[in-house]
Amino acid sequence: MIKATDRKLVVGLEIGTAKVAALVGEVLPDGMVNIIGVGSCPSRGMDKGGVNDLESVVKCVQRAIDQAELMADCQISSVYLALSGKHISCQNEIGMVPISEEEVTQEDVENVVHTAKSVRVRDEHRVLHVIPQEYAIDYQEGIKNPVGLSGVRMQAKVHLITCHNDMAKNIVKAVERCGLKVDQLIFAGLASSYSVLTEDERELGVCVVDIGGGTMDIAVYTGGALRHTKVIPYAGNVVTSDIAYAFGTPPSDAEAIKVRHGCALGSIVGKDESVEVPSVGGRPPRSLQRQTLAEVIEPRYTELLNLVNEEILQLQEKLRQQGVKHHLAAGIVLTGGAAQIEGLAACAQRVFHTQVRIGAPLNITGLTDYAQEPYYSTAVGLLHYGKESHLNGEAEVEKRVTASVGSWIKRLNSWLRKEFDANGLINGDRPIRBCEECA
């Protein structure tokens, strides 16, 4: 069995309220991610992104990891781990530094980003991500990459995503109990955006909403930059609960009915379609019209989407007042397990009054039959995030080696200069042999 570290393999692990998913991806030379292992199992011990039964979570993680290892024929030692929950918060900050040389260096960029993130965050919270939005040099704004440009002062605008220390520790603890190392914690909504959005959508303005079992993770982009992140602690499970109460059926059966027969828009359901609904307490199952089922599902999905719409409208007003691009010309992208229900895009268009699409993972090869579903968007996004970290890590090593060689050559030149200076061989004192000697 090959160790994951022996090849360019990255592993993404999502521990959600409804499911635990583990994906193993191989980073190909062209930058594509080739999925070679998939593992998943129903989640136990999680609620709205938080751990409420550690032992149950550990068992679920182990089961998903075992499946992925078996399929990929590799030994997993570390993972990129998704994190969600209402404790996730965000803030946009600005930093400014003088430019040290004639032109901006990578060190200047790192300094200005460090200045921007050196702010007070909420008590018992820590910074999860620092994501640059844009830079400004003197009077020139909207710069994406300032390296090599000239100026006196540089400003950076960054988006900070923070999480509660203990919430993060608990989910990491569950993974470490399985003998795994966490390479990095990544906000689930950010991972999903890496998976389902195109560069054009980010540039035009888009909101991605990952609708899971316990939470809806939101990420809003305008002008190519991440402007806002939010977790709403209501999602697909409230729809399941409504079905269970409305028809007196066990929650597990209500979930199966929602997935197989559910529709978020009653007007597209045929009047003669019927659904068999199991009962509780040994009573015989009943038959009901699918239209009746849709009448329970549609109002709840509409309510959930309205919560997202309120968040978007508040953000757009704030961005407009700040003079920042606020239009979402690319509309809304819905993804996640609870986004797979029939009629959701049409239902959402009535709420958002803009174009809506259901987002599936992009830019992957390999086991796409398994992984190219909205259900796996976060896990695939973790692989893309891990790929970037791998490539950036290699570039950083190469940069350090180049810098080290450059420094060695500089020291050698300095030593040679001193030696030649001592012998009077520099600054025009170099002895010239007599022409006759050359003859």
UniProtKB/Swiss-Prot annotation:
A Pfam family assignment: SHS2_FTSA
Stated family: Belongs to the FtsA/MreB family.
Taxonomic source organism: Shigella flexneri
SMART domains referenced in this protein's UniProt entry, alphabetically: FtsA
NCBIfam families listed in its UniProt record: ftsA, PRK09472.1
Gene Ontology CC annotations of this record: cell division site; cytoplasmic side of plasma membrane
Keywords on record: Cell cycle, Cell division, Cell inner membrane, Cell membrane, Membrane
Membrane topology: Peripheral membrane protein
Cell cycle among keywords: yes
Record-level GO BP terms: FtsZ-dependent cytokinesis
Transcription among keywords: no
Subunit structure: Self-interacts. Interacts with FtsZ.
InterPro entries: ATPase_NBD, Cell_div_FtsA, FtsA/MreB, SHS2_FtsA
Protein name as catalogued: Cell division protein FtsA
Role, per record: Cell division protein that is involved in the assembly of the Z ring. May serve as a membrane anchor for the Z ring.
Domain of life, source organism: Bacteria
Lineage of source species: Bacteria, Pseudomonadati, Pseudomonadota, Gammaproteobacteria, Enterobacterales
Subcellular location, record wording: Cell inner membrane
HAMAP family: FtsA
Gene this chain is encoded by: ftsA
